């Protein structure tokens, strides 16, 4: 395993190692990609955890009940594999597929100012949650916000009116009292 990572700013978290599988050094992985198997399309990963960074190569992977089971090059022992539990799986941003003009990766939405139809600033998108019905944006107050409330807004066409990545703004149809 090589220890020369990509620049941290250029990396996107696409999964997380959460446990070991068997005695041959396989690890259990939760994939943030959709579908989850898309994570296996990236043969080289940068692993990060508490200041530690490792470069690894994917040998094989398969689906399981709670995610993926993955074999990494040079990882042949259960005890060694256990040391990777908790590591984030990252890939360079440049490897992500291009999206349609009206589609966005979650990382692109994080940090956008959220302004409603009445020009009221709610705050900034902190992160998104995956729910059964639709994704939900967690909007936390920032300097100049209408109030100090954290808001949960659905990421739907009915709520999100416009996104301007260059301006760093998302316009929404949402009442300030909700």
UniProtKB/Swiss-Prot annotation:
Chain segments annotated as transmembrane = none
Query: SUPFAM superfamilies given for it?
Result: PRC-barrel domain, Translation proteins
Q: Does the keyword Cytoplasm apply?
A: yes
The family database entries (Gene3D superfamilies) matched by this protein are listed as: PRC-barrel domain (2.30.30.240), RimM (2.40.30.60)
Task: Give one GO molecular function term.
Answer: ribosome binding
What are the cysteine partners in each disulfide bond?
none
Q: Which domain of life is it from?
A: Bacteria
| Record remark on domains | The PRC barrel domain binds ribosomal protein uS19.
Which family does the entry's similarity section mention?
Belongs to the RimM family.
Write the protein's name.
Answer: Ribosome maturation factor RimM
Its ancestry begins with: Bacteria, Pseudomonadati, Pseudomonadota, Gammaproteobacteria, Pseudomonadales
